[in-house]
């Protein structure tokens, strides 16, 4: 009987010792889809584009990245070619409607990206026009 208890407790200890990061990207998307947009927001009641990708980096990749689009662009690894983008890469756009002049989202696959789009849309998946990309950054090398 003792052997059975020990056998059961070891897997449970392993499960509870896991960190809360490394959430699969698909699960993260499902959890945040249609969250309202709020400039300066950082949670489910409202989030802006840079806080959204900051949260994604932490929850999916276990990496804490800077809070603003400008500091994110400056601190992350450069992806030189649009053809070498991978799911999870951050894509930055110039934006006249953003206070910083930039917008950021997370590349998914098949020319789609996930982002906190603005007050009317919130967090959505959008088709990507690669011509509109300003720069691409990778969270993990």
Regions from the language model: what does each represent?
Residues 4-15:
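Sec-dependent N-terminal signal peptides
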Residues 18, 84, 97-100:
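Short glycine/proline-centered loop/turn elements that form peptide/ligand docking sites
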Residues 17-34, 135-141:
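Non-catalytic ligand/cofactor/substrate-binding and regulatory segments of enzyme domains
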Residues 34-47, 93-134:
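Glycine-rich catalytic cores of cysteine/serine-nucleophile enzymes that process amide/ester linkages
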Residues 35-87, 139:
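Catalytic cysteine-centered active-site loop
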């Amino acid at each position: 009987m003792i052997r059975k208890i020990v056998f059961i407790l070891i897997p449970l200890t392993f499960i509870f010792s896991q960190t809360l990061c490394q959430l699969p990207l698909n699960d993260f998307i499902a959890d945040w889809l249609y969250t309202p947009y709020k400039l300066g927001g950082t949670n489910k009641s409202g989030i802006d584009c840079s806080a959204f990708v900051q949260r994604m980096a932490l929850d999916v990749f276990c990496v804490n990245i800077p809070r603003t689009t400008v500091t994110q662009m400056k601190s992350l690894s450069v992806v030189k070619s649009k053809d070498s983008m991978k799911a999870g890469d951050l894509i930055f756009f110039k934006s006249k409607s953003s206070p910083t002049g930039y917008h950021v989202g997370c590349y998914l696959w098949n020319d789609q990206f996930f982002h906190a789009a603005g007050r009317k849309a919130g967090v959505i998946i959008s088709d990507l026009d690669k011509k509109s990309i300003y720069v691409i950054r990778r969270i993990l090398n």
